[in-house]
Amino acid sequence: MTKMLVLYYSSYGHIEAMAKAVANGAKQAGATVALKRVPELVPEAVARSSGYRLGQEAPIATVAELADYDAIVIGTPTRFGNMASQMKNFLDQTGGLWAENKLVGKVGSVFTSTGSQHGGQESTILSTHVVMLHLGMVIVGLPYSFKGQMRMDEITGGSPYGASTLAEDENHRDRSPSANELDGARFQGRHVAEVAAAMQLGRSHLQPELVR
């Protein structure tokens, strides 16, 4: 059975909601899913005064456990078109796994959130893809078979690079992920799980010396 990690960082709960949808989609495809988050770097007093969503129930992941999964789906909000520092700090600690090729051949995928429609969704996902490529992972996005990313009747996240959500409306008020955005996240989770399962099946028919 395919083992998937949905690894996320969420300040205000938008990515947390998307992460849960990704996990649910993967479970629909028969994957065993762990939903975990990376450590917070912001001091608790500052996070509390800034309205961060504290006490999220997902446990904290360890770097070493990344090698235990067949697929890793990362969720991070944007920070000026790049992943959040909390996620970058975590991934910067994977040097040991990189040196031993522990993540080579594993499926990787990314989803994100931004505060505006053009706030860096695609660049955030692509910058995270770069890390995955250095680790030898096989990248999977959100294919156009998810028709929700083609909608023109509403402002919505989602692109072929990955699911996404907008965290604010046009009046800069907090906005929860829409039904369409959550559908995209579930689709991505299911798609990643299916690709990872197919890769597992394919490897089972290879000669051992040809695997990775």
Swiss-Prot record:
EC numbers, comma separated: 1.6.5.2
Taxonomic source organism: Rhizobium meliloti (strain 1021)
Catalyzed reaction equations: a quinone + NADH + H(+) = a quinol + NAD(+); a quinone + NADPH + H(+) = a quinol + NADP(+)
Residues reported in the UniProt entry to bind FMN: 10-15, 78-80, 113-119, 134
EC category name: oxidoreductase
The keyword Oxidoreductase is assigned to this record: yes
A Pfam family per the record: FMN_red
Listed cofactors: FMN
GO cellular component: membrane
Family that this chain belongs to: Belongs to the WrbA family.
The entry's keywords: Flavoprotein, FMN, NAD, NADP, Nucleotide-binding, Oxidoreductase, Plasmid
InterPro entries: Flavodoxin/NO_synth, Flavoprotein-like_sf, Flavoprotein_WrbA-like, FMN_Rdtase-like_dom, NQO
Region described as Disordered: spans on this chain: 161-182
Protein name: NAD(P)H dehydrogenase (quinone) 3
Residues involved in substrate binding: W98
Coiled coil: none
